[in-house]
Amino acid sequence: MDQICGWIDVNGNYNSIRKWKTKFNVDYLSNGIAVCQGKAIKSPIVIILESPHVDEFDASGMPKGPAQGKTGNRFDKYFEQLINSSSVSNVIGTGSHAVVLVNSVQYQCSLGKQPLKGKNRSNCDKNWKLCFNAGGNTDLIKRLNALNPIAVINLCTASLKKDVDQQICHFSNYTCGYHPASWHWRKYRKIQ
């Protein structure tokens, strides 16, 4: 499930973020158009993450959306600062642009466990690569084409970033940065 988490308002030299407490799901129509609440999404900024983890599902197993828990909290706290110091801030036109959170693989590769480090991280990465190479990469490209983004920012974890880079680096205004979960360390607060 991909979601709009807010809007970037571009006015001159500074981009401000309007965030919502509620995120809005993106629907992909059969004609290749991405919509939110029945309206076409125009010129969004797309943030690529890896796959949904345990925090992104409710107690009954229904998806809540990308970037929940620490990742979402750090994204909310630092994204405005980082987007304003990135190369993306120089290329997006004036106006409002939706910020769309996209999991590159739509399946829970962590299998209900916290993929922090060690064996859980390794198993999660192996599962992600299996899914990505078995059609997840094609699905990601279809969703990005439907969104027709003004910019794409790859914030996948380091171990998976290269796989995603190889598939989507041809999109205009493509850049990358560190995963939001690592943004609590100042040296990792960066979007190129």
Language model regions located:
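Active-site and ligand/interface coordination hotspots across diverse enzymes
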Residues: 1-71, 142, 146, 187-192
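Glycine/proline-rich loop-helix segments at beta-alpha junctions forming the active-site rim
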Residues: 2, 108-192
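A structural preference for short, hydrophobic beta-strand core positions in alpha/beta folds
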Residues: 30, 101, 176-178
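Short secondary-structure capping micro-motifs at structural edges
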Residues: 32-35, 61-63, 80-92, 138-142
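Short loop/turn segments at strand-loop or loop-helix junctions that form parts
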Residues: 45-53, 101-112, 156, 181
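Membrane-associated lipid acylation/remodeling enzymes share a hydrophobic transmembrane-juxtamembrane segment
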Residues: 69, 73, 153-154
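Short, surface-exposed acidic-centric catalytic microdomains
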Residues: 72-119
